[in-house]
Amino acid sequence: MTLPKVSVVTVCYNCDKLLQKTITNVLRQTYKNLEYIIIDGASTDSTAEVIETFRPRLTTVVSEPDRGIYDAMNKGVRLATGEWVIFMNAGDGFAADDVLQRVFAEERAADVIYGDVVKRGVIRKAEAPHNGHRMFFCHQSALTRTACLREYPFDIRHRMSADFKLFKQLFLAGKRFLQLDFPIADFDVTGVSNSLRSAGLKDNIRVISEVDSLKERLRLLPRLYFVYFMCRLRGR
């Protein structure tokens, strides 16, 4: 079996220590058919020095201003030459050195392959594919066909939930989701989406309002509005 090429994309901005952790983790992957793309938003800390340390082992490096994390992720997709893309952003990492080897130990008839995630040392199980008010997996634990990411680029109007919109669009378009029963990623819990929960919920409300049918909006939005207002009351 020919191993498909995987493009690992890391986007970063002024997070030199987290970036070093992620690059070190990615380069430990035992999978052979892999390229590594770094998209830096013109950092002003020592990110450039960190990248230079690893430069011989990096496939592509871009350092220029962007319009936010999802704009940077779209840049990574445009540069990817692999059949599959996985985003492993600064601070995140693969759950084990042989993750990609396990993912592609057999041929996968899917458009999105996803698994569990490790948060604070605890495995959080992904859910079966469904259309919901939030993502049913963590995007760092998902490999997506490059063609799908080019057909449905991240909508940079959404500052926090463009990934939610993308995967919802893929699900509603009938793309094939394959759930694997092991952890793919070790997720950094200090990110923006974890520190501003009410803002993330508000953006999810926008996504559902844009993408879902009236029937689905009536099913999904009441609960989401309730959780959103409770978070606002608690100052989260």
List where the protein language model places each region.
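Conserved nucleotide-sugar donor-binding catalytic segment
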Residues: 125-203, 207
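A conserved acidic beta->alpha catalytic loop
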Residues: 32, 40-49, 89, 93
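Glycine-rich, basic loop-to-helix element that forms the pyrophosphate-binding segment
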Residues: 63-80
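Short aromatic/hydrophobic "clamp" motif used to bind/position activated sugar donors
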Residues: 85
